[in-house]
């Protein structure tokens, strides 16, 4: 295999990014030097390890997984694993950093020449869902293990995650400004409601089932843009919680 060969379809494999090109390079732990476009045997082996580590983290959860579990699943000796990474936490970091970096990188590339806010939102939703539908184990790891990293590793991943969230919020703000609506949903609510719709598909969506990815994207986009009861008069959507209703605790003594 040529060291310079690009994969035929990067959406079908776990993409390898520049693990050494960190914004806080002076503070980050030393990681293997791997150019993002050089698919050498070294790159492919680490990719293989990360893909299997993500699957095991998704199945057992991060804290219940040991490096020995990953060694057995990959057929790579413990000494071999530590040749590629220093710890289990570093594996988790590489998975999270790679995912956020890749999905953000592709999104920014696709949005580069797009001006219409609604088109930007459709691209955002399609980019997010199509990526994670192809990487369901990684999506579960991102959702469940968001706080499992600590220190500089957590800070580094959180920086990319925050950038991604701010981009979604900015697109929604542009849509609000374009529509000039007098009654507007709070931007924070809208942003996290959108991610809530997209991020939990690993609980129910089957990429091999009847609902294809393109149909999933279309349904989520329509639901977010138009609502479940599209066409219902606005006056019927007015709702105010009853005054005086107390929060309900699961513990009776707290009610």
Predicted segments with their positions:
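Amphipathic alpha-helical packing segments from all-alpha helical-bundle domains
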Residues: 101-104, 108, 152-178, 188-192, ...
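Generic hydrophobic, amphipathic alpha-helix propensity
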Residues: 45-54, 70, 91, 95-103, ...
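Hydrophobic alpha-helical connector segments
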Residues: 109-134, 191-194
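Helix-turn-helix
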Residues: 35, 48, 56-90, 94
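Short, hydrophobic secondary-structure boundary micro-motifs
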Residues: 140-143, 184, 235-237
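Amphipathic alpha-helical linker/stalk segments
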Residues: 36, 95-122
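C-terminal peripheral helix-coil segments that are non-catalytic and often amphipathic
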Residues: 3-34, 130, 134, 166-174, ...
């Amino acid at each position: 295999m040529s060291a310079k060969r690009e994969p035929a379809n990067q959406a079908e494999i776990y993409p390898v990014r520049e693990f050494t090109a960190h914004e806080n390079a002076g503070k980050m732990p030393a990681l293997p030097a791997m150019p993002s476009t050089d698919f050498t045997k070294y790159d492919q082996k680490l990719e293989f390890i990360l893909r299997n580590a993500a699957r095991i983290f998704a199945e057992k959860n991060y804290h219940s997984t040991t490096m020995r579990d990953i060694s057995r699943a990959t057929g790579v000796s413990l000494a071999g694993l530590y040749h590629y990474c220093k710890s289990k936490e570093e594996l988790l970091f590489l998975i999270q950093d790679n995912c956020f970096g890749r999905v953000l990188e592709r999104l920014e590339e696709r949005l580069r020449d797009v001006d219409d806010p609604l088109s930007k939102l459709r691209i955002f939703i399609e980019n997010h869902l199509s990526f994670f539908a192809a990487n369901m184990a990684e999506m579960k790891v991102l959702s469940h293990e968001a706080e499992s990293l600590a220190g500089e590793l957590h800070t580094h991943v959180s920086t990319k995650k925050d950038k991604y969230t701010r981009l979604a919020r900015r697109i929604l703000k542009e849509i609000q400004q374009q529509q000039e609506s007098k009654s507007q949903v709070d931007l924070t609510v809208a942003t996290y409601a959108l991610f809530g719709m997209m991020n939990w598909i690993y609980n129910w969506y089957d990429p091999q089932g009847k609902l294809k990815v393109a149909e999933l994207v279309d349904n989520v986009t329509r639901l977010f843009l138009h609502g479940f009861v599209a066409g219902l008069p606005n006056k019927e959507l007015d709702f105010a919680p009853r005054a005086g209703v107390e929060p309900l605790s699961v513990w009776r003594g707290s009610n």
